[in-house]
């Protein structure tokens, strides 16, 4: 049975994001992945912060003139017979809710772990988000060219801390200065590492079979014997890879390598295109939509604002769920019930410019947005339904916003509500006073908000610390108990940008006590957009 051209395009797509703690090697791995996808010719071009981090690939220049930096947001490249979409999840200081929400637009994640450090804080948080949808996870243990922790220990830590089984696919031979390569458990092959080849794709020498004398000659008898001993242990103690369990998010295939030395990344990519799912079905408030449906549907998961005051433009990122996007097509923006013609969508196509006019399920397109599109918006060819599962997350950092000119309260509120619709920040209005509290998950969000209030709304504001530790959305089916709760806790209650009732806790202890005191009230960490 031959698939229709449309279904062939759907089957080729793989959409994933990389999750890691800052400095675990995400930027380097992104660069090496693009190198294998022939999106860039030589690595060493994704620079760190010092040079404003532009992954320079020629097709990314197109939006530069318009002053919107979408450079590293979405990268598409061919690999084997697939088309891979890699969504960037900002790390470091520009970490924000966008990072969380990007994970709702992918079908699979690659978790990168610094093998010298193991599971770190940011990785834990991002994994929690992937668990909301049981997203399949591949794992890459990075930095084998340095001294690392015991590989078995690393697997145990992932299993215990992140509650996901590990199925090693490759196993390291030595580490640091003694790093010799990896053995592939399912191909019964050893791939030998050469140093100094990080910027190019190298021809790797392969030794077939674990008991091959060539292996002892290549890595030394001691390391070869150590490998055989460790593998006996590994095969007895760890999970075998099972594709169904992987797709259910219950086990993660684990690869070892060094992104900097460009070794092992291709083994992981091979696994990704072979095992990761093609575009998955998505739930709406009325039915499930599958990628094979020919009518177009998509949802907005991120809005990127432009910090250049000369361009008021914002780009809404939409994940295509079903159907084919074609230039000039008419789509319905379900929330406002209006039909819009989309003629200038940005498509993120690597190299091949002739296909800029169309996009398929799994692809991400950018819509120009002049304040009319919100996060969570659904676009269809007329069907009235809304995609679910694009969450708001309870913020972890809070500040009070204060005006320099008290007469501008109205503009301030308008600005904050619009910025919260866009996902730049969350805003809370306490019921008991006139404060305005903003919440974020990354500290940079506050600076962005103050700068945008000034440039877009002509409001000069400053932020100051406030006694808030965390927030939870509250609801209850017991009206009487809920009224009592609201009456007794008025000082701690606020409305968010969408007028949803929120409990603002001064300390975690306070939150825990309040939750115990009111078992009939539900305290939620996430809320649907």
UniProtKB/Swiss-Prot annotation:
GO terms for molecular function: GTP binding; GTPase activity; guanosine tetraphosphate binding; translation release factor activity, codon nonspecific; translation release factor activity, codon specific. Signal peptide: none annotated. Residues 11-280 form the tr-type G domain. One of its GO terms (biological process) is regulation of translational termination. The keyword DNA damage does not apply. The keyword Nucleotide-binding applies. SUPFAM superfamilies: EF-G C-terminal domain-like (SSF54980), P-loop containing nucleoside triphosphate hydrolases (SSF52540), Translation proteins (SSF50447). NCBIfam families: prfC, PRK00741.1, small_GTP. Belongs to the TRAFAC class translation factor GTPase superfamily. Classic translation factor GTPase family. PrfC subfamily. This is Peptide chain release factor 3. It comes from Klebsiella pneumoniae subsp. pneumoniae (strain ATCC 700721 / MGH 78578). The lineage of its organism: Bacteria, Pseudomonadati, Pseudomonadota, Gammaproteobacteria, Enterobacterales.
């Amino acid at each position: 049975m031959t698939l229709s051209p449309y279904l062939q395009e759907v089957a080729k797509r793989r959409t994933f994001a990389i999750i890691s703690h800052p400095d675990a090697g995400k930027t380097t791995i992104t660069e090496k992945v693009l190198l294998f996808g022939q999106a860039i010719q030589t690595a060493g071009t994704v620079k760190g912060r010092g040079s404003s981090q532009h992954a320079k690939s020629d097709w990314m220049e197109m939006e530069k003139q318009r002053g919107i930096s979408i450079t590293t947001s979405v990268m598409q490249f061919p690999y084997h017979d697939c088309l891979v979409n890699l969504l960037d999840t900002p790390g470091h200081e520009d970490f924000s809710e966008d990072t969380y929400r990007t994970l709702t637009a992918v079908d699979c994640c690659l978790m990168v772990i610094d093998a010298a450090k193991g599971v770190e804080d940011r990785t834990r948080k991002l994994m929690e988000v992937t668990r909301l949808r049981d997203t399949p996870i591949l794992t890459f243990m990075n930095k084998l060219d340095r001294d690392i922790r015991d590989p078995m220990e690393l697997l145990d830590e992932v299993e215990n801390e992140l509650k996901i089984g590990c199925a090693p696919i490759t196993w390291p031979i030595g580490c640091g200065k003694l790093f010799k390569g990896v053995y592939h458990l399912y191909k019964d092959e050893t791939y030998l590492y050469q140093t100094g080849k990080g910027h190019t794709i190298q021809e790797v020498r392969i030794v077939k079979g674990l008991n091959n004398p060539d292996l002892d000659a290549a890595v030394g008898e001691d390391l070869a014997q150590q490998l055989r001993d460790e593998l006996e242990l590994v095969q007895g103690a760890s999970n075998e890879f099972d594709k169904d369990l992987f797709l259910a998010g219950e086990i993660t295939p684990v690869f070892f390598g060094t992104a900097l030395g460009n070794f092992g990344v291709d083994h992981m990519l091979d696994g990704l295109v072979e095992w990761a799912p093609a575009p998955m079905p998505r739930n709406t408030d009325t039915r499930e939509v599958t990628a094979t449906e020919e009518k177009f549907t998509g949802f907005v998961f991120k809005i990127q604002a432009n910090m250049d005051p000369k361009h008021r433009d914002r780009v809404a990122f939409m994940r295509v769920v079903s159907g084919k996007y074609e230039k000039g097509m008419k789509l319905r923006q379900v929330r406002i019930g209006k039909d819009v013609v989309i003629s200038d969508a940005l498509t993120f196509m690597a190299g091949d410019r002739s296909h800029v006019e169309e996009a398929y399920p799994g692809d991400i397109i950018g819509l120009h947005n002049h304040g009319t599109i919100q996060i969570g918006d659904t676009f269809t060819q007329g069907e009235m339904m809304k995609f679910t599962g694009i969450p708001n997350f309870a913020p972890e950092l809070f500040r009070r916003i204060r005006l320099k000119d008290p007469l501008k309260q109205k503009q301030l509120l308008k600005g904050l509500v619009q910025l919260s619709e866009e996902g730049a920040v969350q805003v809370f209005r306490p019921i008991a006073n006139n404060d305005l509290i903003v919440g974020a998950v990354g500290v940079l969000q506050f600076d962005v908000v103050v700068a945008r209030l000034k440039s877009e709304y002509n409001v000069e504001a400053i932020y100051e610390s406030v006694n808030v530790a965390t927030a939870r959305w509250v609801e209850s089916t017991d009206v009487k108990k809920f009224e009592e709760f609201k009456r007794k806790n008025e000082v701690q209650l606020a409305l968010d940008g969408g007028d949803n009732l929120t409990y603002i806790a001064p300390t975690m202890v306070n939150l825990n006590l309040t939750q115990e005191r009111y078992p009939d009230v539900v305290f939620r960490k996430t809320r649907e957009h």
